[in-house]
């Protein structure tokens, strides 16, 4: 049994579940120790498959109902629909290559992303029956991937002021120290730096609030601020519960954040 961190929306949503996996029992000497569903970060393939099978069984879905992209810090969004489901496995994998967000209205399909400090965002318009998930690292945030997801949801029939968004466990501002080139990227992308950047007085280093930056992107895209909630779990501070590349290194497991219509 995998312990799941339930992600709640600001308003009650019927028939939709959203969650992030936790690592479970951890061997501190092994950066992959615990529950990892990501198959392209160097973990043992059989361990990853076992974790996926366990989660699918726990959620009451088939293994091929777990859909996750091969993320590359892009701003590409894929729609998981009947046409996608009709593709063979190789065609599906090709369609998910270089994708960092998914949208679907299909019931019983668990869409999700894998993160280790980046911000996972789940979104829903329950009236339209549309759910989505995105992976927003600093590059995806600068590229406003959350806006791209909202726009795709609306193309599929969602109404922007009905959309609710919840951010899963991710790195907190205190832990997310960045170089000046990252600050400059946010500046060039016209983010309000006063809202998202602070300097550590002792080191002079910049720290960015990725959650606040993504909240700003969502609000600018038309999602009501009252409809956005953020997990307060920091992946780096709580690296024994959630994977953290900053703490464990890039060769480590990933936290899976998913959403589905029951």
UniProtKB/Swiss-Prot annotation:
One of its GO terms (molecular function) is oxidoreductase activity, acting on diphenols and related substances as donors, oxygen as acceptor. The keyword Transferase applies. Pfam families: Cu-oxidase_4 (PF02578). Binds 4 Cu cations per subunit. Changing residue 40 to A: Loss of 1.0 of Cu/mol of protein. Loss of catalytic activity. InterPro entries: Cu_polyphenol_OxRdtase (IPR003730), Cu_polyphenol_OxRdtase_sf (IPR038371), Cytotoxic_necrot_fac-like_cat (IPR011324). Its cofactor is Cu cation. Cu cation 3 binds at residues 36, 40, 68, 114. The keyword Transferase applies. Keywords: Copper, Hydrolase, Metal-binding, Oxidoreductase, Transferase, Zinc. Its EC number is 3.5.4.4, 1.10.3.-, 2.4.2.1, 2.4.2.28. Cu cation 1 binds at residues 73, 75, 118, 135. Optimum temperature is about 60 degrees Celsius. Is fully stable at this temperature. Purine nucleoside enzyme that catalyzes the phosphorolysis of adenosine and inosine nucleosides, yielding D-ribose 1-phosphate and the respective free bases, adenine and hypoxanthine. Also catalyzes the phosphorolysis of S-methyl-5'-thioadenosine into adenine and S-methyl-5-thio-alpha-D-ribose 1-phosphate. Also has adenosine deaminase activity. Also acts as a multicopper oxidase able to oxidize a wide variety of polyphenols and related compounds in vitro. Belongs to the purine nucleoside phosphorylase YfiH/LACC1 family. Homodimer. NCBIfam families: peptidoglycan editing factor PgeF. This is Adenosine deaminase RL5. It comes from Unknown prokaryotic organism.
